[in-house]
Amino acid sequence: MQKTAIIVPCYNESYRLKAEAFINYAKNNKMVYFFFVNDGSIDDTLEVINSLCRSYPEQMHCIDLKQNCGKAEAVRQGFLKAFEFDFNNIGYWDADLATPLEAINTLCSLLDRKQIKIAIGSRVKLLGYRIERAPLRHYLGRLFATCSSYMLRLHVYDTQCGAKIFKNNSDLQNVFSHPFNVRWIFDVEILVRYKMIIQDKGLGSLENYALEQPLEKWTHIQGSKVKIRDFFLAALELIKIYRM
């Protein structure tokens, strides 16, 4: 595996942040580094992150945002910090580990292919795969993904899974160079920005450079900050991206 940075945005995650899981993974994967971004948490998240980083400083780093900026900006700040180092790949991962850390290896293996620049985890319920989602969330998610694919001409099955890794290059740095226009569906805006860069260069379709990987395991974790009403806010943001 090439040298990889994983951004982990954290807002009030003190009870859900699985320190032992991160440490065990880091011990067995010396080429993976974690950047935990404390997004102005008002609980003990910062203390948990600092304790985690002290216990394994070689591969774990803390970025402390004094004010809550939202997940989109927290992820972006993490990428900007990672750009200061010589990482081959940079991605982001949900702090609750709904997607197991072992999937990092799977996504990174996709980036070993010459032309692939984007590796996306996808929650596809296949035979023998353990994808545990609440039915209502699943159907709302499928509706949103279908609308996104149709409106933005992005043939992506699952835009919102919080497990994505990218090759570190000038295009990626351009994508993250300025704040996102949306708060909830920045995952979609990332792909749209990348698509526009590729098109401006005359390099064809984003589909030539991105791969979705069905995850073997994904588990809905209690305490999610995403509410049903947020799907309606996401629809409004989708229109905003469409007008970019």
Please name every model-derived segment.
Residues 65-84, 89, 101-184, 221-223:
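Acceptor/aglycone-binding surface of glycosyltransferases and processive sugar-polymer synthases
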Residues 15-19, 43-52:
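Acidic helix N-cap motif at the loop->helix transition within catalytic regions
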Residues 8, 22, 31-41, 63-65:
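Short beta-strand/loop segment that forms part of the nucleotide-sugar
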Residues 12-27:
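Short, well-formed alpha-helical segments that are part of the catalytic scaffolds
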Residues 25-29, 52-57, 81-88, 195-207:
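Alpha-helix termini
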Residues 1-2, 177-244:
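Hydrophobic helical membrane-anchoring modules
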Residues 38-47, 97:
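A conserved acidic beta->alpha catalytic loop
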